[in-house]
Amino acid sequence: MKFAVIVFPGSNCDLDMYHAVKDALGEEVEYVFHTETSLEGYDGVLLPGGFSYGDYLRCGAIAQFSPIMEEVKRFAAEGKTVLGVCNGFQILVEAGLLPGVLHRNTGLKFMCRTVELKVENNETRFTSDYAAQETITIPIAHGEGNYYCDDATYAMLQTNRQIAFTYTDNPNGSRGDIAGITNKAGNVLGMMPHPERAVELLTGGTDGLKLFTSLVKQGAHHVKTTV
């Protein structure tokens, strides 16, 4: 597979995402600047963490209007793989590709530490290499990771099995302990924790690696069956 890492002004986890794909997975990856208007030739899109446009107005609120985002929407509508991590998750929500909103953490402080997650659905293209209900350890680094949605949306997420990851010990107040969700089609995932920072033992663990290996296996299968 060939991946595009979207770079917005203020992105700071693009290097980590690039490293996870190129060095940990050995897959092809390129940076794509936010002013571009084509994703032709790519099989997957990765929206990294950071502080796009300085997080002015709201996290991701300005980035959603970047030229590349219209192409990301088209890409997602075609059933292709889109992953947004931390600020990338916030951008996906602001762009309407995922439901809900991300508020300030309940403690009103930026948090940077490792947390435990539970794999709620291992039947997505992002989680198939994990065991059902597997507990994994992944870093977080955010000040606005408190996921919220209304009752109807939360019921929909549960019914459609769109909740991919939950926190075992909720650090930010997210509704239902939600750490990551997919769209209804299952080809778009947004999550606040950083799997790209957990792909090597040297840097603290490899629990994030299975997300990327799942993505490659399932994504490659999807590409083959839809060409």
Curated annotation (Swiss-Prot):
Pathway: Purine metabolism; IMP biosynthesis via de novo pathway; 5-amino-1-(5-phospho-D-ribosyl)imidazole from N(2)-formyl-N(1)-(5-phospho-D-ribosyl)glycinamide: step 1/2. The keyword Hydrolase applies. One of its GO terms (biological process) is 'de novo' IMP biosynthetic process. GO terms for molecular function: ATP binding; glutaminase activity; phosphoribosylformylglycinamidine synthase activity. Gene3D superfamilies: 3.40.50.880. Residues 3-225 form the Glutamine amidotransferase type-1 domain. Pfam families: GATase_5. GO terms for cellular component: cytoplasm. Part of the phosphoribosylformylglycinamidine synthase complex involved in the purines biosynthetic pathway. Catalyzes the ATP-dependent conversion of formylglycinamide ribonucleotide (FGAR) and glutamine to yield formylglycinamidine ribonucleotide (FGAM) and glutamate. The FGAM synthase complex is composed of three subunits. PurQ produces an ammonia molecule by converting glutamine to glutamate. PurL transfers the ammonia molecule to FGAR to form FGAM in an ATP-dependent manner. This is Phosphoribosylformylglycinamidine synthase subunit PurQ.
